[in-house]
Amino acid sequence: MIAKNIELNGLDPATRALDILYWKNHCIKQLESLLCATDSYCTADKAAQLRILSELVLPNLGPRPSNATGPSYLTRSGSPIMLSLNTTSSKNCVRYCWEILGATGASNDDPLAVQVAKDVVASLSATFRLSTKWSETLLSNFAVTPDQARQVINMLPEWIQGFVPEGMECDFPKRIPFAMTSFDLNGSNVAMKLYVNPRVKEILTGTPSSDLVWEFLRNLTPEMKPRAVDLLERFITDNSGPSAIELVGIDCVDDAHLSNARVKLYVHTMSSSFNTVKNYVTLGGAIWDEQTQKGLGILQSIWHLLLQEPEGISDNGFDKPVNDSSMLCQKLYFSFELRPGTDFPQVKTYVPTWNYLRTDGETIQNYEAIFRACDHPWGEDRTYGKIFQDAFGPATESRKKPIHCDASFLFTEETGVYQTLYFSPPIEGETEVQSNLVA
């Protein structure tokens, strides 16, 4: 299965081959290791997934670091791909998210890789026979022209400084990601999602991202229930402010399944207290059914471990400081999932683990304690630690950036505890990659 070739704009084939080889050695062994760890994929499934990664994803991660205009800002390590493990009591699976950079990455002609995103999404949609009704609407609503993208990049430092504590200077990124996609690996197939950053349009126009998103939601077909959108708009406006929406995500499905597809809004908070979690998960008390209460009870019992505080925390108002307060750091994230015809969104909690961890080794211990508390076998016999080491090397290894990125939690009666652990593969020098090839 090979997607339609994207125009390479005269790029040297030998250069492209080296770029793809670099990304292959950056993540393919790690992905294969995680696939094996889940015990959910047969030999044919694993081969199919590695082929999809090699043929559809690696060519679209941009140039290798030495040839790129700058790093990806998807992950802390600068990697354009984030691997993850999804776990429930009955099944584990692998997922990955990647910034859409095409062959050229962010370039002078396409500074935020907007046109690249349109081309790659169209190609993937054709390959997997997916509807483009929502994806085209999402991309067109938040896209900017190359000239506008250059304006956004010039405006970025001042815009970011407005979110940093007074008197502090932060290390400004050269750009912000515009579009990402993710693949849930289901057997030999993938379920695709598309994510677009509404902040690009916000920076350019001065219109808060939330206002832009509500307009997008209300014009989708099949339509979302007005009651559900109104409820979410009131809550986010009252609790998060007009610029809280970080990402808009959609399920990419065929036309027959569009009526059950999700739109996901991601918002951040500047507090990590469990009181904040309770407020967001219940939409200020609007959602208070038995399932929500049960999920909150489980989450509360492991909250200190997710915050990397194994000795416990003082109370539900405990607000853990981030590791580096000079950075633009959001303390928690929440996603609100809407489907056509539903009255309430489903809320998932995300912890940016990298903001709180001391070392990957300590985080492994905390995650294993979480698995034990949730009756998941990865908490026994140092199983999770072995999974991590097999994929990424010893946790004791000195790294500039941690490999653990984020963690998410959701509880439903159907799946039980649903957790996702996210990983940022370290960016290696090209001489290191060549050494690994020789070895």
UniProtKB/Swiss-Prot annotation:
Pfam families: Trp_DMAT. One of its GO terms (molecular function) is transferase activity, transferring alkyl or aryl (other than methyl) groups. NCBIfam families: arom_pren_DMATS. Disruption phenotype: Leads to the accumulation of paspaline and 13-desoxypaxilline, but also lolitriol and a small amount of lolitrem J. PANTHER family: INDOLE PRENYLTRANSFERASE TDIB (PTHR40627:SF5), INDOLE PRENYLTRANSFERASE TDIB-RELATED (PTHR40627). It comes from Epichloe festucae var. lolii. Its EC number is 2.5.1.-. The keyword rRNA-binding does not apply. This is Indole diterpene prenyltransferase ltmF. The keyword Nuclease does not apply. Indole diterpene prenyltransferase; part of the gene cluster that mediates the biosynthesis of lolitrems, indole-diterpene mycotoxins that are potent tremorgens in mammals, and are synthesized by clavicipitaceous fungal endophytes in association with their grass hosts. The geranylgeranyl diphosphate (GGPP) synthase ltmG is proposed to catalyze the first step in lolitrem biosynthesis. LtmG catalyzes a series of iterative condensations of isopentenyl diphosphate (IPP) with dimethylallyl diphosphate (DMAPP), geranyl diphosphate (GPP), and farnesyl diphosphate (FPP), to form GGPP. Induction: Expression is down-regulated when the stress-activated mitogen-activated protein kinase (sakA) is deleted. One of its GO terms (biological process) is alkaloid metabolic process. Substrate binds at R95, K193, R262, K264, Y266, Y350. Belongs to the tryptophan dimethylallyltransferase family. Keywords: Transferase. Pathway: Secondary metabolite biosynthesis.
